[in-house]
Amino acid sequence: MTYPNLLDRFLTYVKVNTRSDEHSTTTPSTQSQVDFATNVLIPEMKRVGLQNVYYLPNGFAIGTLPANDPSLTRKIGFISHMDTADFNAEGVNPQVIENYDGGVIELGNSGFKLDPADFKSLEKYPGQTLITTDGTTLLGADDKSGIAEIMTAIEYLTAHPEIKHCEIRVGFGPDEEIGVGANKFDAEDFDVDFAYTVDGGPLGELQYETFSAAGAELHFQGRNVHPGTAKGQMVNALQLAIDFHNQLPENDRPELTEGYQGFYHLMDVTGSVEEARASYIIRDFEKDAFEARKASMQSIADKMNEELGSDRVTLNLTDQYYNMKEVIEKDMTPITIAKAVMEDLGITPIIEPIRGGTDGSKISFMGIPTPNIFAGGENMHGRFEYVSLQTMERAVDTIIGIVAYKG
């Protein structure tokens, strides 16, 4: 189905810079997210028909569409995030390519282009309307496409009371891209049976498995002396960092893994002979494998300290989120419903693990099973990001189908 306000709504959203800041100590991490929620989203939530609309100190804008059929007793939530990834988001100037011809798309005057030879996903979209960047910023389809789709679904349901639906709760939140947005989510206040994050990629994505994730911070204490007299005295902290890294499995890196394979990812190394630091992220799907990865890093640190004769390697591990499959597989109702709705709409569900996490990873462990459905974005987090308007329309169709489902 086509929705006349969907495109303009999306374009309005992406032009607002809501980039999050991982170094911030506030919630939300940037004032621009507060302003976007209070000045743009809250008024529009009220305009499209949501009731009891409010903004919480945790950065979430919340609203409710009451059920219009007493036989539909479920309460279902839909959640998308306001922030965008760590890439230039100032001056977003989207291009709208109608009836895409399947060829190369020049991204404004930036010199960058979307070429099917480089981005095979473009082969799915001839004849569709694509929204791209101008090559100088990201687009923000992750996840403003999700926000626009949820808002449009509510608008349509309000205008069409003949479509019977259950109670719907909507939540637009901050800081998903920096991994802390759901930390303060109020599950008791949201009060639904289950929810969906509308934060996926291409048409048909339906996901209920995520990585389990941890961060590892390492400190290496060296001993600096003049290199001319260093033998037997110097301990090079940078060399310790190299030695530690070289004891990790050589092929367990993001660029060499796929599917259900986990990894260690070295994110940053800084330091000198005297002192060095390294930051890793650890990812795996199965709980035992996840715990084994953390234990392996600790074992390497312990072994190095034993060989060095002092505690020169310090490891701090912090769990970040867990595979929501552990929660959702106890009651697959949200997956069963979404799958049935997609199939009724002629959409082939793509049920694959997310090689990452969503707000739903944390919210699921707060007591609200929250799988993820497609929002349409491709090549997210950079200048080559784009989205199909037709895929966004199908996401709206899916949301409407879920809340009207009577099975």
From Swiss-Prot:
Reaction(s) catalysed by this chain's protein: Release of the N-terminal residue from a tripeptide
Keyword Secreted attached: no
Enzyme Commission code(s) on record: 3.4.11.4
One GO process term, biological-process aspect: peptide catabolic process
Entry keywords, A to Z: Aminopeptidase, Cytoplasm, Hydrolase, Metal-binding, Metalloprotease, Protease, Zinc
First-level EC class: hydrolase
Main location per the UniProt record: cytoplasm
Cofactor note: Binds 2 Zn(2+) ions per subunit.
Family: Belongs to the peptidase M20B family.
Protein name from the UniProt record: Peptidase T
